């Protein structure tokens, strides 16, 4: 796992085995095996890359598969055809299968809802009006860029008005998520347990850490992509050590892969990545071999907002695809018509 490009076997040998082979090159070998925990991490093209190594031509060429995957947004029943095609080539083992790991505790996942504050409601309504006017006069690549940018703004606003506005302060009462975070973490503190708080935004890691320090009455830790490798190792060792370090705030990308943080048995996704595979990888920093307690996972959502509606749509997609298709990021949202987008963005109180 430490050497994802390591190839076991030589060119021209009987068998090649690759680990995490999302960017594979042609190798001359008769038998091929790929080991991966996330066959589809960000987009369907990940799956095509794997099968282009395993069985070239099975899923067509890259352009053909791209056209096919685009159609799935409008015709989800096509997932069943794809599942049927690739099923004979996949041997899947889940950690939750007791025949695979007999002593792994339970994972309890729940959606945790927060109400917007009055300030958030006002800003949300203003942002919706602004976006409506903007997308009406744009098209093509520019329109898609505006939609993705708008989604980011909504996420920031749903986290905290100060994150969206780029101001300081981060008052608790101005964010429904901060209020819910206190409620959950006070219970964790009473039990002297530990929690991982994931966010996709580096800029809110420090405000979250300061807020949590007030709840736990002691300092926690922060881990994001800007922290040097040497310090990252010390940070992980400190969290996993015998001293009570109650929390770690992590950026989703920096903390999503390759870390062992089993001292925590609570995981909070403060904002959503909208990709089940990425979120599950982050959760698995705590829910993995070595964990002795049941792991409780909270996925924060603000009620009546774009967060709640996208989550509902993804649940429906997940049921249709039955986990063969993890996600296409947020790009599928950019293909929506104007009226569909406005219905997605509108605030329902």
Segment roles from a protein language model:
Residues 20-100, 291:
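Conserved P-loop NTPase motor "coupling/switch" region that bridges the ATPase
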Residues 38-44, 56-59, 72-73, 118-121, ...:
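Conserved nucleotide-binding/hydrolysis micro-motifs of P-loop NTPases
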């Amino acid at each position: 796992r430490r050497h994802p490009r390591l190839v076991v076997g030589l060119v021209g040998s009987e068998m090649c085995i690759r680990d995490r082979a999302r960017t594979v090159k042609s190798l001359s070998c008769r038998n091929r095996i790929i080991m991966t925990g996330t066959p589809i991490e960000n987009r369907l093209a990940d799956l095509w890359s794997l099968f282009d190594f395993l069985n070239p031509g099975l899923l067509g060429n890259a352009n053909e598969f791209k056209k096919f995957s685009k159609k799935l947004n409008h015709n989800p029943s096509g997932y069943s055809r794809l599942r049927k095609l690739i099923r004979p080539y996949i041997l899947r083992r889940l950690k939750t299968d007791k025949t695979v790991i007999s002593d792994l505790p339970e994972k309890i996942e729940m959606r945790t809802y927060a109400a917007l504050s009055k300030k958030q409601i006002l800003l949300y309504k203003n942002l919706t009006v602004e976006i409506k006017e903007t997308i009406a006069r744009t098209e093509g690549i520019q329109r898609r860029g505006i939609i993705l940018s708008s989604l980011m703004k909504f996420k920031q606003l749903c986290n905290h008005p100060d994150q969206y506005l780029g101001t300081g302060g981060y008052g608790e009462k101005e964010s429904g998520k901060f209020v819910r975070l206190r409620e959950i973490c006070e219970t964790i503190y009473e039990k002297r347990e530990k929690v991982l708080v994931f966010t996709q935004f580096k800029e809110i890691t420090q405000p979250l850490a300061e807020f949590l320090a007030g709840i736990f009455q002691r300092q926690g830790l922060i881990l994001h992509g800007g922290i040097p490798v040497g310090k990252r190792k010390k940070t992980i060792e400190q969290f996993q050590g015998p001293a009570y370090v109650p929390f770690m705030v992590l950026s989703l990308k920096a903390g999503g892969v390759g870390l062992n943080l089993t001292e925590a048995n609570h995981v909070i996704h403060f904002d959503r990545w909208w990709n089940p595979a990425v979120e599950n990888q982050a959760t698995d920093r705590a829910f993995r071999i070595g964990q002795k307690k049941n792991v409780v996972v909270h996925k924060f959502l603000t009620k009546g907002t774009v967060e709640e509606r996208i989550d509902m749509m993804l649940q429906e997609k997940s049921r249709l695809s039955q986990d063969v298709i993890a996600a296409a990021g947020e790009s599928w949202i950019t293909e929506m018509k104007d009226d569909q987008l406005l219905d997605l963005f509108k605030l329902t109180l």
